[in-house]
Every structure is written in C-alpha cells, then in structure tokens.
Amino acid sequence: MRLYSSFLQSAVLVSVVLVIAGCSISYSSKSISDSTSSIVSSPSSVSGKSKHYQNEVADYTMAYVKSSQPNANYSTFLKGLSEVAAKEGVTHWEQDSLTYIGIGKGLKKAKVEGIAYETYKKNFAQSDDTRMEEIQIGYESED
Amino acid sequence: MWLNYKFVLFYIAFVAICLCSALASAASFEYLYVEANEGNSSGGHSALQLGDEIFHYQHHDSGFIRLLKENQQDFHFQYRFLQNRRIHSSQVEVSDETFLRLRDHFKLQFLAQDQQFKQLHRLHKDRALLHVLLNRQDAVVGTDFATILRLNAAGLFYAEGELDRQQKDEYIGLVNVKPSQSFSLLGMLRRKIEQHYGQDYLSRRSEQITAQIRSLTPSDWPLEQSMLAVDKFPPAIESFAERYTDHLSGLVAIKVLMEERMLRPDAFLLTLEAVIPEEKEALERLRDQLMLSLVKSIHSRRPDWGYAVLVNIARLVAIDMTLQLDQWVFVDDFGMDSEWISADELAQYAESMQIQIDDALSNWMQMRKVLLSPGDLTEANYSKLEMSANRYFELLKGAWQPAIRVVGEKALPTKSIAVPDWVVPELTQQQLTLALSALNSYEAKFRQELAGYYRYDLITRNCVTELFRTIDRALLPLSQADVDSSKQPKYITEESIRRLGGHISAGYNFIPFVSFQSVQAQYRVMNNVILDSYRDQQLKKQLIQNDRLTVSLRESNTLTSTLYSYHPGDAFFVFFTDGNAVLRPIAGLFNTAAGIGQSVLGLLTWPLDGGKNFKSGATGILMSVPELLFFNIRKGSYKYLSYNQFVRDNASKY
C-alpha cells in the first residue's frame, strides 16, 4: 500500500512536470521544409517573390533605424542587409532596385522624416542619385 | 411616401453604421495551442500567428529562450505532420491598427534579439582571433580556432589548409602578374575588369586590402550602463574578426581570378541531365548577367564583397560548364552542418525516401520551368534551382553511396576553409592584451544583460509567459513607454482589454493548455478550429474508406498500425492513447511495461550503443506514467514525410 502510494505520488509529480514543461526541451533540428519550402510554397508570381524580399528588407531597415542614429556606422547595417538577401539566395542586393525600395519602405515604417530621413536616404544610397530615387519610391509607396 | 423615404434613410444609416463597425475590427490573429508529444515541447506549445507568419518562443540549448519567426506552412509541417500534434487555433478579433501594432512589434523584437545573439557570436570570434594573435591558443582549451574563423565560399576553390601551404609571398606576387592572355572564362572576366578599372587594378586592390589588414585595430567595445533592450539592436560595433575575414575573402577572390582557378572536384555537382535549347538560351543570358554583375561587385565597398564575388565566380563556372557539356552542372550548396543519413537508415526508410525523391524531382522540374518564364530569370530563382538540384541529385546518390546528406542545402553556397596565415593585423602584445581585457569586460556585461532578458525558467520565463509579455509590450501606449514603470501594468491592462477583449497575465499563465483556456475566456475569440495532426488526417481517410472497427483495432497499436512505424527517434510504445480516454490507464500500463523492457534491453546494449536504448526506454516510461492518470502526452512522430503532399492537402488553409 505504501509502495503504491509512493508510486502514485511520483506519477503525479512526473505528470505535473511534463505538463508544465511546455517548451523546456528544445533543440535545433533541421527539417526537410528548411530547404523545400521556399520552392514549394513561394508565390508563383515575380511580384509575390519580390514583395517578400522587399518586406524583409523593410522590416530589417525599420528595426535598425529604431535602434540607431542617422550618422551611425553603416557597415553593420550593410552586413545585416547581406544576411537578409542571402536568405533569399541573393548576393547582388546592392545592384537590385528592390533593395532600395525596401529600404524606403522601412524608413517610412519607422516614421523617419525630415532631416533624419534625408540623412538616412543619402547614406543608405551612398549618395547615388538612382538609389536615392528608389528609396524615395519605396518611402512614398508605404502607407 | 414621406414615411417610406424616412424608412429608406434610416435603413441606409443603419447599414452604414454596421459597416463602419465591421471595418474598425476587420483584422484578426490566431492564438495557437500545440498539443503535447514526446520530445520537443513535451507539455505542449504556444504560438501567435500574425498574417502568414508564426511567432513562438523556444528554449535553446544555450539556456536562453529565443523568439522564432516561421513561415506558417513550415510551422504546421513541423508540428502537425512530423511531430504529429494537433493544433488548436483561436481566431481573435482585433482592429487593423492593433493587428499592425502586434505584427510590427513581434517582428522588431525578433530582429533585435537575432542581432543581439549574432553579436554574442561575433564576440566569440573576436576572442578567438585575439588569442591567436597573442599566440595563446592554450587559453582556448577545447576550442578549435580553425572551426571558428572560416572563409565562406573559399572552399569551393581551395582545399582545407591548401592556402596555408603556399608561401606567404606567393599571393603578393600578384603585383607583378602580367595581363591575362587566357581565353578561359575567368580570363575573359579578368580582362573585362582590367578594361573597366585599369590594367593593374587587381594588383592594386590586393595591395590595398593587404595594407588594410595590417592596419586593422580591434573593435571599440564601450561599456555602458545599459547595452541592451528587447526591442533594439545591440550597439553597432564592427567585429574585428569579421573585418579580418572579409578582407581575406577579398584577397582570395582576387587570387581565384588571377590564377583562373577552377572549382574543386567536390565543389560542384555534374548531373547527367541534358539541357534543352530554351534552357541554354536562358543560361547564356544568365551567364552574361553574372559577368556584368561581377565586374561591378569586384569594385564594391560593402564589407562582404569578397564572399559575393567567390559565390558568383563559382556559379559562373558552373553555368559555363553546363553550356559546354549540355548537361546541368551546379555548385554544391550543402552546408558544413548538413545532416547525413547512412545506407542502413536509407534502407530502413526506403518507402519514405522514395517519396522524398519524387518530391525532389517534382521541385527540380518546377524550378526548371520557372527559369524559362519571362521576368523570372533572377538570381533568387537560380538559387532555388540550385537548391532543388542539389537535393534531388544528392538523394539519388543514396542508391550507391554509403551515406548521403538528407538536409542542409543553403540558399547560397558556403563551402569554407580555415583562415590562412598570410597576413595579420600588426598589433603589439600590449595592444592585444588591452583589447582582450576590454573584450572580456564587454562580453561579461553583455552576457549578464542577455541573461537578464532571456534566461529560460520553467515557470517564470517560458514559451507561454514570453508570448504574453511580448503582447503586453506591443500594446503599451507609446505615450506611456517612458512613464513610471509602476504605472505601466495598469495602462497595459486597460489597453489589452480595449484592444483584445481582456488581459492575460504572464505570471499566472505559464502552462500551454491553461493559457489556451485563458485566451478563450479573456480575448475576443471569434472562432476556434482544431487542425488535425498527420495521423488524425490519415486515420479519418481510412475510417471513411474502410470498415471502422477493423481500422480502429488495427491502428490502435504500433504493432499492427499501417500509419505509423516505430523509429529510434521515439521511445518504444505499444498503444496510442490520444483517443479513448477511458482505456488510457490500461494502455498506459502496457506502454510503461514496454518502456521498462526497452530500458532493460538498453542496459545490455549499452556497450554497443552508448546508452541510447536505455535512455529511450527511460523516456518511454516517463511518457507512459501520465497515461496511468488519464493524461496523454505521447502520439508518435514521423521522421520523413512529404512536404509537397502536406502543401497539397492543406492548400485551402494557406
């Protein structure tokens, strides 16, 4: 009887711990979906894919801008942009107008305006007129 | 007539008011409760779906709790299919503004945390470099410098250690290299670069980079009172080690061009698949585009231009080989951390692997068609084509190789080598010692702050509590963010009630299914849906198509089930207990006995399997005990399922 009672107490304890342990055991494991989802589920249209990339760039830009000053060191920003582009399989992001349109969207999402906006625009575009225009297009297109 | 007119006006006004109300609350998000199962998140899990992205927290091995952002299909495939768990989805009605606020905040927090942990990783690399420069490798006991500092994509052209074996002055010999006379592809590229930037451009660039490396100084790691916040990037500090490896990558890229170096044999995949004429035309255009891009990239000022040039030279060579041979050739894009599967395991999962091969073939054919679509000849699509080809042809190798890579393709090739010892920053011992000391102080403070925000705790900081805390932070009115923190809870509660219908306290809701009940009780839930697990779906199909009693009996246990096969990833069990609750304790008894049996067997096989069987048996007992008390946790899981089939079967939901 005493043995049964101990067993029951242990069973309850184990059950409670397991139930509470919502996410206590976690590991990083690769899955088939890691490599196939971008192929199987990606939007079939060019505009769908480019929109996803723009949004990723915009989100990253917004997050960066909210944490920094307009004249901050941009190397870390560029490294982060490379990482965002790399996930989409893109290396030539700096030659891609979608990147700058995304940056413009991100600046608008971060509610940057006035002199701060002009400074970011010039720095992100490295003073290239075409790039600055593309950033402006992205900025104006964002609600 | 006048009365009719008034009635019509009243009716129009009434409809307009209803429409406005509907528009004000036109959005929704889903609160997801994932049922329990053995292994990952054994007690269940919680997540928030905002649009087509799902945010959830997970406890990592590092001891921290991390916010993850996943594509909804990936999340569902992982949890509902592979882990075989039902998901309970509650649709919560919110205004458009609230939805955007939640979504933007979760994205911001995800990105901020991601950057914070990336900086921690960079600090680790900086430390490794400083130690090597100080010639104190013994101080990094257990850490292999060669595994920490790598040159990505350089491994496509050079073997591990090959660059070290070269004389250090060999690469400097580039200064006096004659203009290229070669008509090889890389010779042509080199000539284009020289025409564009000058005859000795590559030599000058090489000298410039060398000088930059020599004059590199360690990063400035300023100690501030508070470095981190959950919704801000960490201080923008350029990593010393990354500046060094970026410069070295540039030197290697120039070296590849100067030597007109070919891809290593293990760096590319030669298929026997013929290229059709339309594909050849597309590839010729792509090759020309790549050449133009490379001419620009070599002159880029972005920090990682060297890596980009290496990847694109490799792809240029692969595309050119494809055109020369009329057979598809691709750069190997499997990462160094790819998951391997042995021939024995392949044989064990022969049927599942054939489905994987069929899926891979379908994806590979699909991407070939995409490349031919007007406007779709993009770098991103070529990357997907490369990934799909790598996957398909690697799986085919399973027929004759002892082991293959089953998962691990990357969107960009990264085959790496350890940093060669050509040239190092010229720093004195004193400078290095001071830098290491500053780094130590910075890293200690950094880790302390990280732990303060993200140290996992079973009850006070887990995947459920952090979800609600993030919701609270998202809803905190901007005007109140700087207010006395003691007043913030009141504002948060008010906002939560106004926007979501109620407030759920993280402190009292740390158990997944309890939090799910709270969501039902507190939030403005419009709709509840139970999304079937993989086994649920298949079982329902069988019950419709066959005799119910036969199916129920056959599928009740792992010995006769056609829907589940035991695999070592699960602890062995006899009966499924997620169905009939009344018989659960009886089934649990058998399962507990099975777990004990596996543990005893495990003791005998310990010398052969390192305790794997024993551990599995012990887990089996642990999972079976709750069943004796009518709780169900374990449901069995699947190692290999068809992702394509999952997308097809669930297309209407996405």
PLM feature spans:
Chain B
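Hydrophobic alpha-helical membrane segments
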Residues: 58, 67, 97-105, 109-110, ...
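N-terminal signal peptide c-region/cleavage motif recognized by signal peptidases
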Residues: 19-21
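Bacterial N-terminal signal peptides that target proteins for export
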Residues: 1-12
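Active-site nucleophile-His-acid catalytic modules used for acyl/amide transfer and hydrolysis
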Residues: 30, 81-226, 230-231, 410-504
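Carboxylate-rich, polar loop motifs that coordinate divalent cations or form catalytic acidic clusters
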Residues: 24
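Glycine-rich catalytic cores of cysteine/serine-nucleophile enzymes that process amide/ester linkages
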Residues: 27-124, 151-154, 188, 207, ...
